[in-house]
Amino acid sequence: MNHSNHMHHDNHESHHHYSGHAHHHGNFKVKFFVSLIFAIPIILLSPMMGVNLPFQFTFPGSEWVVLILSTILFFYGGKPFLSGGKDEIAAKKPGMMTLVALGISVAYIYSLYAFYMNNFSSATGHTMDFFWELATLILIMLLGHWIEMNAVGNAGDALKKMAELLPNSAIKVMDNGQREEVKISDIMTDDIVEVKAGESIPTDGIIVQGQTSVDESLVTGESKKVQKNQNDNVIGGSINGSGTIQVKVTAVGEDGYLSQVMGLVNQAQNDKSSAELLSDKVAGYLFYFAVIVGVISFIVWMLIQNDVDFALERLVTVLVIACPHALGLAIPLVTARSTSIGAHNGLIIKNRESVEIAQHIDYVMMDKTGTLTEGNFSVNHYESFKNDLSNDTILSLFASLESQSNHPLAISIVDFTKSKNVSFTNPQDVNNIPGVGLEGLIDNKTYKITNVSYLDQHGFEYDNDLFIKLAQQGNSISYLIEDQQVIGMIAQGDQIKESSKQMVADLLSRHITPVMLTGDNDEVAHAVAKELGISDVHAQLMPEDKESIIKDYQSDGNKVMMVGDGINDAPSLIRADIGIAIGAGTDVAVDSGDIILVKSNPSDIIHFLTLSNNTMRKMVQNLWWGAGYNIVAVPLAAGALAFIGLILSPAVGAILMSLSTVIVAINAFTLKLK
């Protein structure tokens, strides 16, 4: 089946392997209640109940009932832990499941021995069994893991909500104009679908009829409704607000925005950062630490008291209280929450390492056009320098060449020329001049569009006073050359984004230096930089110059973040310690960029830094808890404070172990963007 032609969102739910027991999630709830039925009579018939109550539930042969029920409980209720431990050993990564499996196995096997000694041996005295402890241990473990898996599942909740945004069906407009409700999986590219007010838009597409306002808050985090007119793009999963629209489908299945986002997030969550690799290693050592401490505590208490029941209880408690799981989940749970929140707000984290690196960023380098400014240019001035050519002829020549480019400056010139009703032609042999402009043939004459740097480098004469006047007003200026003569010019202005000023101020408050990198001329660059409060400016750059500048800053030991276009600035984004591709829109699969910002909003740079800070704080909290819990709990379980009467039973150990993981999960779930 070709997924590029079919929509499939039935299986969007992410599959994160947070632990070796993730696949038992559905079993824990059922197993807990079934095990409870077996555990109640075991507990009621135990000698412990006779000590605590004025009457006993025991009857002749009740010890056999306890044995049979305990055996069923061990193999049924204990199965997730026994099979989980087996899987961990097979993978040569023994951890929490192996410890629990060892604990309940020791309790069960010793209880079998005690049952034999009490019923079939001629030895005098009574050997205490652990059937009561075994029952409570398995019950608490099942309950704890059921609660834990619910908490773990909530960590990636934002991503699951995204998966549920797409409807199951859509209204397809047939060739004969009839409307027909079809499954999403039957929708193909170029189909026309109709979406009424209040409905979820089923696929990515282009509006071909109607206009509306669209709520993208659940898709990109855009809080305000976005006005959409004919020929505007819409994203599948966003909510159609005010009018009925018809949408031509542009992407389905894995090519759709939501599918791409969830694919990138899943990939990021499966990759391990250096901090996670370290916590995994420590969690792995913790297994051996717990086993060694458990065995030593058994030997020491046998030497001190010669009481096998007490010594064995210490061993079992150590095995069940140690929780490499809390340490192992400390980072993955925060990551799941962080990447999901990011995706929900239009911040796609492709490289998790960048979240850690962001704590140490010294410089944020930004392209001017489209990042700090709107990138929507307006033509403010155009002029002919040749007596026999009118201003409109110059405009026509500019538009003819620029019609072959998709650069924002080019699009602005073409649109302006059309609005002036000035005609232009299709040129021949148009070539891009990197970092300069274009050249091509019009009516068998060669024309070049260049910047002022090209004129200076090649000794062309031009009106420098006019250039300075227009440039200081913030205009980008292009020149037209024919037969080694400058015959005309055009000046285009760009607006600074409202949020750029605040973003620069926020960077400075964080002691991060903003740097402007632009191919535009010095005058324009410094005019924009001055208004924004940026003092570090590099102008008139070729594409390769940006990469070189980043390298120079890094050579002094600085950490550099680069923000720019995911395609044109690809080398710079790759060179930087963190590359942020801004304004990706629905094309979130751009190759370069550790972080993808769906919107062209400079505020999202600060949002990423805030998310990074909050994420790292939660990771550190969880690591301290995971490590600190084990450092304190294991010696307590071994009986380190038994001399003052503080002794933990296996049941209490099981409760503490389950709680330790639940606390880590809840702490991860409290992570917020702001």
From Swiss-Prot:
Keywords: ATP-binding, Cell membrane, Copper, Copper transport, Ion transport, Magnesium, Membrane, Metal-binding, Nucleotide-binding, Phosphoprotein, Translocase, Transmembrane, Transmembrane helix, Transport. CDD domains: P-type_ATPase_Cu-like. It catalyses: Cu(+)(in) + ATP + H2O = Cu(+)(out) + ADP + phosphate + H(+). Its EC number is 7.2.2.8. It is found in: Cell membrane. Residues 1-20 are annotated as: Disordered. Gene3D superfamilies: Calcium-transporting ATPase, cytoplasmic domain N, Calcium-transporting ATPase, cytoplasmic transduction domain A, HAD superfamily/HAD-like. SUPFAM superfamilies: Calcium ATPase, transduction domain A, Calcium ATPase, transmembrane domain M, HAD-like. Its main location: membrane. It is a multi-pass membrane protein. GO terms for cellular component: plasma membrane. Pfam families: E1-E2_ATPase, Hydrolase. PANTHER family: ATP7, ISOFORM B (PTHR43520), CATION-TRANSPORTING P-TYPE ATPASE-RELATED (PTHR43520:SF5). NCBIfam families: ATPase-IB1_Cu (TIGR01511), ATPase-IB_hvy (TIGR01525), ATPase_P-type (TIGR01494). Involved in copper transport. This is Probable copper-transporting P-type ATPase B.
